[in-house]
Amino acid sequence: IEFTQKAYDLDSVNEIDFPASENLTAEGILENSATLSNVRINDFSPSEQFYNQTQSIRAYYSFFDVDVDRYMIDGEYTQTFLSAREINYDNLGEDVSWLSKHLKYTHGYGITLSRVDAITATGQPKMIIDNIPPESDTQDIQVKRPEIYFGESTDDYIITNTSEQEFDY
């Protein structure tokens, strides 16, 4: 461990104790309102299920993973769930062939992005980016190139710029 810390230049890090208090006061809440307003109330698994139920949109698209990221929205860092809409070759049915897998269905399309700290009136994730083509409810984040050629489960080769037309959603 000592040599790993040296290799990553972590051997000169200053450690400082941060005393935590278990006493929550109104004053403490007010002083930390930005942090508390960004507390995650959603979870990965239900969000992924919701994305697959409502945002796959086509049978051959799936969401395989949900990541947490922060984006600047309305001047504040906002914690979000992010997931890529990927091609799911298992759902192509009879249309799975070398041509369809490597020349035609070459990419997923778009993402979903939802707040971790907000839900709709029906208890669903509050979407920031959804639909095909991607629609954003904020000017701060716009998807300009929604094609996803490499993702969580997209691990096979494809060939582009051929006479076969790539399928876009």
Descriptions of predicted regions:
Residues 2-169:
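Soluble extracytoplasmic regions of secretory-pathway and membrane proteins
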